Amino acid sequence: MVTIQADEISNIIRERIEQYNREVKIVNTGTVLQVGDGIARIHGLDEVMAGELVEFQEGTIGIALNLESTNVGVVLMGDGLLIQEGSSVKATGKIAQIPVSEAYLGRVINALAKPIDGRGEISSSEYRLIESPAPGIISRRSVYEPLQTGLIAIDSMIPIGRGQRELIIGDRQTGKTAVATDTILNQQGQNVICVYVAIGQKASSVAQVVTTFQEKGAMEYTIVVAETADSPATLQYLAPYTGAALAEYFMYRERHTLIIYDDLSKQAQAYRQMSLLLRRPPGREAYPGDVFYLHSRLLERAAKLSSLLGEGSMTALPIVETQSGDVSAYIPTNVISITDGQIFLSADLFNAGIRPAINVGISVSRVGSAAQIKAMKQVAGKLKLELAQFAELEAFAQFASDLDKATQNQLARGQRLRELLKQSQSAPLAVEEQILTIYTGTNGYLDSLEVGQVRKFLVELRTYLKTNKPQFQEIISSTKIFTEEAEAILKEAIQEQRERFILQEQAA
């Protein structure tokens, strides 16, 4: 028979009492009243904060956006098909944040920073809030370094600087994405990290962009954030902020970044959908009252940081789609007023075969020549003036039949300059090549050629200079000035190439 010893029992009881943890864990919970269309109404969640993440019983995450007296309106970050009425919801005490690290370079991710390219998990130990405050006035400095796009029309007349926000605006199918992707391709070797955010696009279009980046070797310095047209509105709304958080991570590490939002019209539509389903009062074009703040808080995060913060930069190229050229609609006017200039793409120019279809007359960069190297300033001033005069004369020449010789010459020069601005897609030009192209056109060296021969001649001239006179490129890249020596080399090369070209044409 086992003897029961009282002191042993009392020791065990004493130990258990000492181990007893009196911590009380308070969980803020609620119950699903209604769910559907990506929105859930929750009863309870008394302590929930605006923008806080909430977790449903079956694992779906949502964001508490509407805090009303009787219930909480939550937008779902998923389809929410398994959420049932009456199931429980708990507040997480966190607001939306994503992991960030160098390992994201070369990957395709979604708005929650989860990889969607089938290449496994991304290791990361650091987190950043999706919504971070923009740098203040003291944290910034004015934009002064150029960010070359590789497109002559932009780099010469609508220059973009590091830390600038330049809107790309135009109708559908006018080449907006092409301008943005060419800019990314041109950052090769420039030590610029690129983030391309695709919002509400066809999956096939995003796949095409990613393939282009891979073929041209641009993926190694690029992150693609994609939420396609079949994604929930919540994720389409969050995607740009995810991209901005990733770009900021590099910016605060003294790196230069370029971010493209393609496009903000789709983000505004997703936000409108969420707001209307949450029964927020609609305003102009049925957008909610805070749609301006939606874009301003996103675009204000682009900055050129002060020397104290390491002089990193984040350049933003938001894209906005217009309906039949109407820039006075709500979203276009909002984004125009937030950004530091706009590149306007015209359907008429596109259909006339002028590509990139940039309407130089109404496009503008509010940073201006501060974002150009001296060599480009030296040759580009004349180009803008001559093109403006040509546009005026061309309209006038449609009505006048007998034009004097000077006007005819100016029209002929203008046609050749317009030809010089045409570029193939995915073929950005280095700044040295742009300078020689513009110089050749503005100084009349193309006047003797037929309009149809201009592009062929320029391609051959660029190749000739690269192989036979590499010192031209060396002078421009080292001094950033179009020196007399560089001009002499260029004149000589143009002369030699013209003679060769004329002989070739005669032989043909």
UniProtKB/Swiss-Prot annotation:
GO cellular component: chloroplast thylakoid membrane; proton-transporting ATP synthase complex
Family of the protein in this entry: Belongs to the ATPase alpha/beta chains family.
Alphabetized Pfam families for the sequence: ATP-synt_ab, ATP-synt_ab_C, ATP-synt_ab_N
Residues reported in the UniProt entry to bind ATP: G170, D171, R172, Q173, T174, G175, K176, T177
One GO MF term attached to the UniProt entry: proton-transporting ATP synthase activity, rotational mechanism
Taxon lineage: Eukaryota, Viridiplantae, Streptophyta, Embryophyta, Tracheophyta
Compartmental location: Plastid, Chloroplast thylakoid membrane
Catalytically driven reaction(s): ATP + H2O + 4 H(+)(in) = ADP + phosphate + 5 H(+)(out)
Protein name, UniProt field: ATP synthase subunit alpha, chloroplastic
Function of the molecule: Produces ATP from ADP in the presence of a proton gradient across the membrane. The alpha chain is a regulatory subunit.
Subunit-level organization: F-type ATPases have 2 components, CF(1) - the catalytic core - and CF(0) - the membrane proton channel. CF(1) has five subunits: alpha(3), beta(3), gamma(1), delta(1), epsilon(1). CF(0) has four main subunits: a, b, b' and c.
Broad EC category: translocase
PANTHER family: ATP SYNTHASE SUBUNIT ALPHA, MITOCHONDRIAL
Keyword annotations: ATP synthesis, ATP-binding, CF(1), Chloroplast, Hydrogen ion transport, Ion transport, Membrane, Nucleotide-binding, Plastid, Thylakoid, Translocase, Transport
Membrane topology label: Peripheral membrane protein
Site (described: Required for activity): S363
Domain of life, per lineage: Eukaryota
EC assignment: 7.1.2.2
